[in-house]
Amino acid sequence: MRAPAFWWRRPGVASALLSPIGAVVGAVALARMGKAGGRVDAPVLCIGNPTVGGAGKTPTAIALLDRLTARGATPFALLRGHGGSAPMPLRVDPAIHGADAVGDEALLLARHAPTIVAGGARLAGAAMAVETGASHIVMDDGFQNPSLHKDVSVLVVDGMVGVGNACVTPAGPLRAPLLPQLARADAVLVVGDGSAGDRVAAEATQAGCTVLRGWLVPDPAAVAALHGIPLIAFAGIGRPEKFFATLEREGLALLARHAFADHHPFRPAEIARLVEAARAQGARLVTTEKDRARLTGPAFAGPEFSGVLDAIAPLPVTLALDAPHALDALVDRAEARFQARRT
């Protein structure tokens, strides 16, 4: 499902009609968030977001995993494994698991650190990570889930859209009322520029959160390889238009754009149509790393896709922070709290 357009406008008739349901959803979410979570013998750092959909959580989790590794730690990634069908909890092996089994984010995270997909059993997944050598656990999503105690929580916000109309789903994009979420967070990371993100940053500051600023930076080599080539772009992420705008900002030539819902499970027939359209126009297909990761598994293992998927270019992005030592400060805080709860 794609987010309704009215979520990103000032509250109107649609959000007003849905607000009673949003009030119930918000109350239930806050009641769940107030429950004590189970604890494991490792610091837990959670990367979540206050809204439904993507805002840059996975690149943030990757940046944190890489920083922990550079510090000499052995971090594990922990996530639900959205769309995965394999029995969970499960340690991801990219050599045998496709996105159909473990979800797209898990395959990306597993390139940087050992990764556990846990389904709804995050506490069991965290325990598995610790038993197999995790010194730290980085949760990709799960801020609103109470099952696992978090030593540090970071909320990631898209600077362009912020929290939209600031209403709780289905009246708006929020998973729960904003201020109580900020009260449970240690930091808010605003990714990208925009007045909507600035407003969230101001509220986060008033709530006592550390405010960080960051940007998703496309891989220069990948961009250079696509210059001068006609492109057809497709994406099934929280805001596909954000991906398309990135391509245009980098000076790439887009002939067409195809937007799909977040975590869209691509069917072979859909990809075949895109491939044929690209061939007919002498273009190359380009997509996000997440979307490219979903083009794995038995559905895309047939001979008709031999060599075809290699021609679909992913555009990797990395998180750049305005404060170089921000991640170290978060890790230090998590480790201090972990030591305090052990004594």
Curated annotation (Swiss-Prot):
UniProt keyword Coiled coil present: no
Enzyme Commission designation: 2.7.1.130
Reaction(s) the record says it catalyses: a lipid A disaccharide + ATP = a lipid IVA + ADP + H(+)
Binding-site residues for ATP, renumbered to this chain: 51-58
Entry keyword set: ATP-binding, Kinase, Lipid A biosynthesis, Lipid biosynthesis, Lipid metabolism, Nucleotide-binding, Transferase
GO biological process, alphabetically ordered: lipid A biosynthetic process; lipopolysaccharide core region biosynthetic process
Pathway: Glycolipid biosynthesis; lipid IV(A) biosynthesis; lipid IV(A) from (3R)-3-hydroxytetradecanoyl-[acyl-carrier-protein] and UDP-N-acetyl-alpha-D-glucosamine: step 6/6
GO MF entries: ATP binding; tetraacyldisaccharide 4'-kinase activity
Domain of life: Bacteria
Major enzyme class: transferase
Keyword Repressor: no
A GO-annotated cellular component: plasma membrane
Function: Transfers the gamma-phosphate of ATP to the 4'-position of a tetraacyldisaccharide 1-phosphate intermediate (termed DS-1-P) to form tetraacyldisaccharide 1,4'-bis-phosphate (lipid IVA).
PANTHER family in the record: TETRAACYLDISACCHARIDE 4'-KINASE, TETRAACYLDISACCHARIDE 4'-KINASE, MITOCHONDRIAL-RELATED
Family note: Belongs to the LpxK family.
Protein name: Tetraacyldisaccharide 4'-kinase
Lineage: Bacteria, Pseudomonadati, Pseudomonadota, Alphaproteobacteria, Hyphomicrobiales
